[in-house]
């Protein structure tokens, strides 16, 4: 019942419908209010009529796997690549075009754009407080079951780490790990999100000079990538081990990690990281 009430209320607000407008010609406004408070279970016939007005299938209210087609699909694909490359200039350019172009957006799509804006604010304009506040507000208004919640929480965690709020970062990291334990990793977005969280944590451990723990975290995440047959974040994880390994591993071992990462960058056409790896190899050979 809680799922029905929450999804019903969120979808109505997403479409900017008042309770009265939604109820008009179908039922009493008081019934809409009771549904949203979880005090009334509508009949199948009533729910069907309301679902038509809300433009969703009937299963939407009960099945958390049901997704409504996004109007930002192309933008999301492009922005994902730009975020991986840390190309915030092009990300901002595409964001501005999308904001001007988009008219009707679902709540999740609007929240996605807010999430992107917080990243642009943080990295492009050094508006760290505003970006953090924006993400904190996002987390208050969307369900923790949604993909955008996980993205926003992970980004907020990174921001906390970068501004020195270590306790907040570690609390968020623990929360993220708990949430991901409930997700189905057959869903690529959940798998990639989980890998990102673990990579970020390994990077955080490096910043704290906990190199052994960082290597262990990276190795475990690499094993996950192999189990799931994905190369996502594999090159950065190998580079991280190589960088940490200068403290503990032999020169040839470190070199092998860099070379493996370099080959992946060539295969998947990642010139920015490839350039970094070539520099690491030159520095290593000069030692």
Question: Which residues are covered by each model-predicted region?
Answer:
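Helix-turn-helix repeat elements of alpha-solenoid scaffolds
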Residues: 83-97, 122-137, 166-179, 210-219, ...
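Short alpha-helical DNA-recognition segment
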Residues: 15-34
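Amphipathic alpha-helical segments of tetratricopeptide repeats
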Residues: 95-102, 135-143, 174-185, 219-230, ...
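A short, Lys/Arg-rich alpha-helix, primarily the initiator
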Residues: 1-14
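Residue register of alpha-helical TPR repeats
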Residues: 73, 112, 151, 189, ...
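DNA major-groove recognition helix of helix-turn-helix/homeodomain DNA-binding modules
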Residues: 45-60
């Amino acid at each position: 019942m809680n799922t029905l009430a929450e999804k019903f209320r969120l979808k109505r607000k997403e479409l900017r419908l008042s309770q009265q407008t939604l109820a008009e010609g179908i039922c009493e406004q008081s019934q809409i209010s009771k549904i949203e408070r979880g005090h009334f279970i509508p009949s199948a016939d009533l729910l069907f009529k309301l679902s038509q007005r809300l433009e969703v299938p009937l299963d939407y209210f009960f099945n958390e796997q049901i997704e409504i087609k996004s109007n930002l699909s192309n933008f999301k694909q492009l922005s994902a690549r730009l975020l991986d490359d840390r190309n915030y200039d092009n990300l901002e350019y595409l964001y501005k075009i999308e904001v001007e172009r988009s008219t009707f957006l679902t709540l999740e799509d609007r929240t996605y754009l807010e999430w992107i804006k917080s990243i642009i604010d943080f990295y492009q304009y050094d508006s760290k407080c505003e970006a953090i506040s924006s993400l904190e507000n996002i987390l208050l208004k969307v369900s923790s079951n949604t993909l955008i919640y996980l993205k926003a929480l992970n980004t907020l965690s990174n921001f906390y780490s970068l501004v020195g709020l270590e306790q907040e970062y570690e609390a968020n990291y623990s929360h993220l790990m708990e949430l991901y334990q409930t997700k189905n990793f057959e869903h690529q977005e959940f798998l990639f999100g989980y890998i990102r969280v673990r990579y970020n944590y390994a990077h955080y451990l490096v910043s704290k000079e906990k190199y052994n723990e960082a290597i262990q975290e990276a190795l475990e995440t690499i094993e996950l990538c192999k189990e799931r047959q994905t190369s996502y974040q594999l090159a950065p994880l190998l580079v991280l081990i190589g960088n940490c390994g200068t403290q503990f591993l032999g020169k040839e071992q470190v070199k092998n990690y860099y070379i493996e990462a370099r080959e992946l960058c060539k295969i998947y056409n990642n010139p920015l990281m490839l350039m970094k790896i070539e520099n690491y190899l030159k520095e290593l050979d000069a030692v």
